[in-house]
Regions:
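Conserved donor-binding/catalytic core segment of Leloir-type glycosyltransferases
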Residues: 188, 194-230
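Nucleotide-activated donor-binding/catalytic signature segment of Leloir-type glycosyltransferases, i.e.
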Residues: 239-261
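Short alpha-helical donor nucleotide-sugar binding micro-motif in glycosyltransferases
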Residues: 254, 262-267, 356
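Acidic donor-binding loop of glycosyltransferase active sites
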Residues: 265-277, 290
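Conserved acidic donor-binding segment of nucleotide-sugar-dependent glycosyltransferases
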Residues: 306-307, 311-318, 326-333
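A charged, aromatic-enriched C-terminal amphipathic alpha-helix characteristic of glycosyltransferases
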Residues: 316-319, 332-361
């Protein structure tokens, strides 16, 4: 490995803690001296997890309430990223689900992009976003998104090497950007809590409260079946979801990792009704020995073993999830909780760091 290589880390925005931010944290552990460039930054992200890091923001940070309104700044993001001067760095490692792949590097520098997904609201989820948009946004979005699609493809061409977080996303990268990508599964903290063989009588869901996660399906299914459901997380749709929840639904809010793992360990099963690019939470659940009942599309097909560590439902409806819950209660899954945890070991944080380091050594340090 060459010495004196200057490395920069790049991330779309650093506001809430999710799977993408956990990837960024592993990048930081690999390159602790590297600054982190991001559009906007909330120092409370991850309970202050990044407060000792060298975090550098764009001019968007100066806009009042930027950490609340950043999602409405889509048309400003390309300019903000392109104005960053990264010419002093030999290697740029980006964690991208939006626009940060569009940073401009030195001609002889290497930009490795860990792509969580091609920009959702520009490509495959565009019509879902449009369907739920206000009248004004419905009027403005088509022309705006058309321009963003052109820029997004240009931005993808600036990347030297793509890494995808699943084979599912590698296919999307190929479709929208016409680029190949190597799959490296995201890091998952494999908990070491003692397993319980007799779980408590509740189902669990851990998620941000946004539409495409389809938490509404889980609530409707558990309402109709009168099953206990604990929901951990928060977000834009919280008011709507609370309004539809019946007496068997509990909202636990945002919890730290230790509190959350207690819920994973004791849950009867984990519900995963959304179509995700990868989906870290089902692996976290399996690391606690908890079976997963998942919508059978997207990344879940690569992390859950149907019939062994969980069950799939094939239609994204409350009725289909209800049938899956009833099937699980009638027949269970093949693996016991110890073997379910063993399956999760192939997604560990150490494995992730080793694979990322190998890529960096191959493309940037030779």
């Amino acid at each position: 490995m060459k010495k004196n290589i200057k490395v920069a880390l790049v991330h779309d925005w650093l506001v809430t803690m999710g799977g993408a931010e956990k990837v960024l944290w592993q990048f930081h552990l690999l390159f602790p001296q590297a600054p982190i460039y991001t559009l906007v930054y909330d120092s409370n992200c991850g309970h202050g997890m990044f407060e000792d890091c060298d975090v550098r923001t764009t001019w968007l940070q100066k806009i009042p309430f930027a950490t609340k309104l950043y999602k409405n700044m889509l048309t400003l993001m390309p300019s903000a990223w392109e104005q960053l001067d990264l010419t002093e760095y030999d290697l740029v490692l980006s964690s991208c689900s939006s626009c940060c792949k569009g940073i401009i590097t030195r001609p002889d520098a290497v930009h490795i992009c860990y792509c969580h997904t091609p920009t959702r609201y520009v490509w495959d989820f565009y019509y879902q976003y449009l369907k739920n948009a206000s009248a004004l946004k419905k009027l403005l979005m088509p022309r705006m998104i058309h321009k963003m699609k052109i820029w997004d493809q240009l931005a993808a061409n600036r990347v030297d090497y793509f890494i995808s977080n699943s084979n599912f996303i590698a296919q999307r990268i190929k479709k929208y950007y016409r680029r190949d990508a190597q799959t490296i599964y995201p890091p998952v903290h494999i908990n070491d809590y003692p397993l319980v063989q007799e779980p408590d009588d509740y189902y669990l869901l851990v998620s941000r409260f946004v539409y495409y996660k389809r938490i509404d399906i889980a609530i409707e299914a558990c309402n109709k079946l009168q099953r206990k459901l604990v929901i951990i997380g928060g977000g834009d749709e919280e008011k709507k979801l609370r309004a539809m929840a019946g007496p068997t639904i509990t909202f636990a809010g945002h919890l730290d990792d230790e509190e959350m793992m207690q819920y994973y360990v004791h849950a009867k099963a984990f519900l995963f009704p959304g179509e995700e690019d990868f989906g870290i939470t089902p692996v976290e659940a399996q690391s606690a020995g908890c079976p997963v009942l998942a919508y059978g599309r997207g990344g879940a097909l690569e992390t859950v073993l149907d019939g062994r560590t969980g069950l799939f439902f094939t239609e994204q409806t409350a009725e289909n999830l209800m049938e899956c819950i009833q099937r699980f209660e009638a027949q269970g899954v093949e693996y016991d909780r110890t073997h379910i945890r063993q399956h999760s070991l192939s997604f560990s944080e150490e494995r992730f760091r080793n694979e990322i380091q190998c890529i960096c050594e191959q493309f940037a340090f030779t």
